[in-house]
């Protein structure tokens, strides 16, 4: 294969059989279980990189079921997302996500900079309870519960919240194994959102300590709200808003 062909065909690795296809990435009946809680403000601020700002000491713990996604297939994801502001405008910062499928893990890290690790999240309905769990190896590190569809939420308001920009700290190491080749803050949004349902109810969240899945480093002090959402949406491509290596 000549150099010109490599340049023209290179998208992702392996060159001749990429781990994931080019976008757009459309999700049908994407199901969210989001528990927002109050946490320790000093610990939270220590984990959020400038120039993002933390308006309140809040964390959203998410369980997301994606049974029908373009190119990525059928998978589940779980992790912590932090409400932030950038240049005075509201958004979210994804701290860490854990999922059970390689293509979105590889694509998420390589394209946008999603901080993904391989684990075993689950989101299901158990009788009258919406139940989310996260296992890292044999260890249960997160359990979320909510009363199933106790009260409907306003769909337009929830769509606006989903449409807020999300920020990611994309880090790609140099081949020397010591320094970062890429270290940048990226921004992406969910697009073409079609809300199909939104509910709330009484909720609980239990986090356990684990050295490699440190979700409990942001302790649960108070549950603020819980939401169960179902929507079709497209995960938009990103843009770089801050380059930490620029001089």
From Swiss-Prot:
Domain of life of the organism encoding this protein: Bacteria
Known EC number = 4.1.1.4
Report the top EC class in one word. lyase
Q: Which reaction does it catalyse?
A: acetoacetate + H(+) = acetone + CO2
User: Where is the catalytic site?
Assistant: 116 (schiff-base intermediate with acetoacetate)
> Pfam families from the xrefs?
ADC (PF06314)
By its UniProt entry, which InterPro entries does this protein fall under?
Answer: Acetoacetate_decarboxylase, Acetoacetate_decarboxylase_bac, ADC_dom_sf
Please tell me whether the keyword Zinc-finger is annotated for this protein. Answer: no
The record's keywords, sorted A to Z, are: Decarboxylase, Lyase, Plasmid, Schiff base
Q: Its Gene Ontology molecular function terms? A: acetoacetate decarboxylase activity
Which NCBIfam families does UniProt cross-reference here? Answer: PRK02265.1 (NF002614)
What does the record give as the function of this protein? Answer: Catalyzes the conversion of acetoacetate to acetone and carbon dioxide.
Entry's family note: Belongs to the ADC family.
The protein here is known as Acetoacetate decarboxylase
Source organism per entry reads Ralstonia nicotianae (strain ATCC BAA-1114 / GMI1000)
């Amino acid at each position: 294969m000549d150099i010109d062909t490599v340049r023209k065909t290179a998208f992702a690795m392996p060159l001749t059989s990429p781990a994931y296809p080019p976008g757009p990435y459309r999700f049908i009946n994407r199901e969210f279980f989001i528990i927002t809680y109050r946490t320790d403000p000093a610990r939270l601020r220590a984990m959020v990189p400038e120039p993002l700002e933390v308006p309140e000491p809040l964390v959203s713990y998410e369980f997301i079921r994606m049974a029908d996604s373009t190119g990525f297939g059928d998978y589940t994801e779980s992790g912590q997302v932090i409400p932030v502001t950038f240049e005075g405008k509201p958004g979210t910062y994804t701290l860490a996500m854990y999922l059970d499928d390689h293509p979105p893990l590889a694509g998420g890290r390589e394209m946008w900079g999603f901080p993904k690790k391989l684990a075993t999240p689950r989101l299901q309905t158990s009788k009258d309870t919406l139940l989310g769990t996260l296992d890292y190896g044999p260890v249960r590190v997160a359990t979320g519960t909510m009363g199933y569809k106790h009260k409907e939420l306003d769909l337009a308001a929830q769509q606006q919240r989903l449409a807020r920009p999300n920020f990611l700290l994309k880090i790609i190491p140099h081949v020397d194994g010591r320094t970062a080749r890429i270290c940048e803050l990226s921004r992406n949004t969910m697009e073409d959102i079609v809300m199909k349902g939104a509910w709330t109810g009484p909720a609980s969240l239990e986090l356990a300590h684990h050295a490699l899945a440190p979700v409990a480093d942001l302790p649960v002090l108070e549950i603020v709200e819980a939401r169960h959402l179902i929507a079709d949406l497209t995960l938009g491509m990103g843009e770089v808003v801050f380059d930490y290596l620029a001089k």
